[in-house]
Amino acid sequence: MAGEIFGTAFLFIVLVPVGLALGAFLLKVQGVQKAEK
């Protein structure tokens, strides 16, 4: 049970920053594309 909770917490700790970075990167790329047009 404790291992399961730790695994889930680890997933959140890893996925949340990765998701935020990915989202920011995508927004940046879209902004650059719009600026070029």
From Swiss-Prot:
Tree of life domain? Bacteria
Instruction: Report the locations given in the UniProt record.
Output: Cellular thylakoid membrane
Which BP terms does GO give this entry? photosynthesis
Q: What GO terms are given for molecular function?
A: electron transfer activity
- Tell me yes or no: is Transmembrane among this UniProt entry's keywords: yes
An example Pfam family from this entry, by short name, is PetM
According to its record, how does it sit in the membrane? Single-pass membrane protein
Protease listed as a keyword:
no
Q: What is its main location?
A: membrane
SUPFAM superfamilies found in the cross-reference section = PetM subunit of the cytochrome b6f complex
Cross-referenced InterPro entries: PetM_cyt_b6/f_cplx_su7
TM regions (residue ranges): 5-25
Which NCBIfam families does the record associate with it? PRK11876.1-2
Say which family it is in: Belongs to the PetM family.
Q: What does this protein do?
A: Component of the cytochrome b6-f complex, which mediates electron transfer between photosystem II (PSII) and photosystem I (PSI), cyclic electron flow around PSI, and state transitions.
Subunit structure, as described in the record: The 4 large subunits of the cytochrome b6-f complex are cytochrome b6, subunit IV (17 kDa polypeptide, PetD), cytochrome f and the Rieske protein, while the 4 small subunits are PetG, PetL, PetM and PetN. The complex functions as a dimer.
Which protein are we looking at? Cytochrome b6-f complex subunit 7
Task: Give the organism, scientific name.
Answer: Synechococcus elongatus (strain ATCC 33912 / PCC 7942 / FACHB-805) (Anacystis nidulans R2)
